[in-house]
Swiss-Prot record:
It comes from Swinepox virus (strain Kasza). This is Uncharacterized protein C5. It comes from the Viruses. InterPro entries: Poxvirus_Bcl-2-like, Poxvirus_sf.
Length: 236
């Protein structure tokens, strides 16, 4: 049974995107700088990621927060001082859309999926996968998506991170730095990193390796990897 879930039209009102594009372009330089500081935290930018352009913000919100795009934008604007008081405008003029745009809409059981599209969140996928590995360690049935991610264990153990995997023990406080690994091959970098942290998640239960992953793997790399993953699953 194909577990592909169509998600674009059922939960998303395209007016949300137009509202976001309209108001983010009206923020002045200082307001936008403040916006980026809050946005980076909500989107798990890596330590080395530079601030996004407005175009990048729109793209990330559209792809990674497809079901709650307006809610995320509104929540950020409530803490960003701005001359237009954007949060109040959205609440008063677009309350219906704001209620539809809910974080609960992002909850998808990625464990069973066979295919994804660009409106599935790569960060949600990786977060759920690493915690699934921590809890079940491949012993629970899953769809083609997680089976594809499980293949990356081999790359991590045979070619890239075998030393870290073999030496990391329960209770260790070893600092893992993967930021310079495979820097010329983004897909290989993402694959091997996912594989390593998946193996470590199944071995070491007292560490949230997803936090380390997101702090070191660029959001831009993750979005590039999502394109690869979509195509890879499509061809299976």
């Amino acid at each position: 049974m194909n577990s592909y879930i169509v998600i674009k039209n059922s939960l998303r009102d395209y007016r949300s995107g137009r509202i976001i594009r309209k108001y983010i372009r009206k923020l002045n330089k200082d307001e936008y700088k403040h916006f980026c500081a809050v946005f980076r935290l909500n989107v798990d930018f890596s330590q080395d990621d530079k601030n996004p352009s407005r175009k990048e913000v729109i793209r990330i919100i559209d792809e990674e927060f497809n079901f709650c795009d307006l809610r995320l934008f509104y929540d950020i604007m409530t803490v960003v001082p701005n001359h237009m008081n954007v949060a109040s405008i959205i609440y008063s003029e677009y309350e219906y859309l704001l209620k539809k745009s809910n974080y609960k809409n992002k909850k998808i059981n990625y464990t069973i999926l066979d295919k994804i599209n660009k409106y599935h969140s790569i960060d949600d996928i990786i977060f759920m996968y690493l915690h699934w590995r921590k809890k079940y360690n491949n012993t629970c049935a899953c769809g083609k998506l997680f089976k594809e991610l499980m293949k990356y264990d081999i790359l991590a153990t045979k070619y890239i991170y075998n030393d870290i995997i073999n030496t990391y023990k329960e209770g260790d406080t070893i600092s893992i730095n993967i930021r310079l690994k495979c820097k010329d091959d983004i897909i290989k970098h993402c694959k091997s990193s996912i594989g390593m942290f998946a193996i470590l998640s199944s071995k070491i239960i007292d560490v949230d390796f997803d936090v380390i992953f997101f702090s070191q793997i660029s959001i831009r790399y993750r979005l590039i990897f999502k394109k690869y993953l979509i195509q890879s699953l499509y061809l299976q």
